[in-house]
């Protein structure tokens, strides 16, 4: 593996870490309704736990209400139960074939708890990025030791990987700041 391949590989993995962070943050509830928070809920569908997004369409009725439209009318009760049993503190209301999920306003205390969760997710993402940097640098050192690349190439590649790491950490900080602002906005 060449130094360029190591840099490309590290960059791709850092991008995946950022995407994973964004995916995890969608699940953290803010004051606004977001259908993404319901996607990880599993519904009992003929004896099989099935993701909610596969048995119903999710949409927004307004800024504080999510509409859940089951594909089968018989699923209304099971979906309602799954949402109620989730640890999100939501209370779905059935209106015939549509389930409305109003998002209760967050208390100040709950907002602070959620910002701590968001910061923790951000720290986990930074740790993942730094581990990727360490792995790439170790790989470069092995190549230098085995005389496959020169020390100058190693130094250049190490500097490039550090720049990628710095950029990824800045991006993580921006994502976290945006989510915290979203949570703290009443």
Curated annotation (Swiss-Prot):
Transferase recorded as keyword: no
UniProt keyword Transport, yes or no: no
One MF annotation (Gene Ontology) recorded for this entry: ribosomal large subunit binding
Protein task: Responsible for the release of ribosomes from messenger RNA at the termination of protein biosynthesis. May increase the efficiency of translation by recycling ribosomes from one round of translation to another.
Membrane-spanning parts: none
Entry superkingdom: Bacteria
Name of protein: Ribosome-recycling factor
SUPFAM superfamilies: Ribosome recycling factor, RRF
Compartment(s) where it occurs, according to its Swiss-Prot or TrEMBL record: Cytoplasm
CDD domains referenced in this protein's UniProt entry, alphabetically: RRF (cd00520)
Protein encoded by which gene: frr
Family designation: Belongs to the RRF family.
A GO term from the CC aspect: cytosol
InterPro entries registered for this protein in UniProt: Ribosome_recyc_fac, Ribosome_recyc_fac_dom, RRF_sf
Example of a GO biological process term: cytoplasmic translational termination
HAMAP family with a match to the protein in the record: RRF
Protein source organism: Polynucleobacter necessarius subsp. necessarius (strain STIR1)
Alphabetical UniProt keywords: Cytoplasm, Protein biosynthesis
Pfam families: RRF (PF01765)
């Amino acid at each position: 593996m060449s130094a360029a391949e190591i840099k490309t590989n590290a960059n791709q993995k850092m991008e995946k870490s950022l995407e994973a962070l964004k995916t995890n943050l969608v699940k953290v509830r803010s004051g606004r309704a977001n259908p993404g928070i319901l996607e990880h809920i599993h519904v009992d569908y003929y004896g099989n736990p099935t993701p909610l997004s596969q048995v119903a369409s999710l949409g927004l009725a307004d800024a504080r209400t999510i509409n859940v439209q089951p594909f089968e009318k018989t699923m209304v009760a099971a979906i309602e139960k799954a949402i109620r049993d989730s640890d999100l503190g939501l209370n779905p209301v059935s209106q015939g074939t549509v389930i409305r999920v109003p998002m209760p306003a967050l208390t100040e205390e709950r907002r602070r708890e959620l910002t701590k969760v968001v910061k923790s997710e951000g720290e986990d993402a930074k740790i993942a990025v730094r581990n990727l940097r360490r792995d790439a640098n170790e790989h470069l050192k092995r190549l230098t030791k085995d005389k496959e690349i020169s020390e100058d190439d190693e130094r250049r590649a190490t500097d490039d990987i550090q720049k990628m790491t710095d950029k990824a950490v800045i991006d993580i900080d921006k994502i976290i700041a945006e989510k915290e602002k979203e949570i703290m906005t009443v």
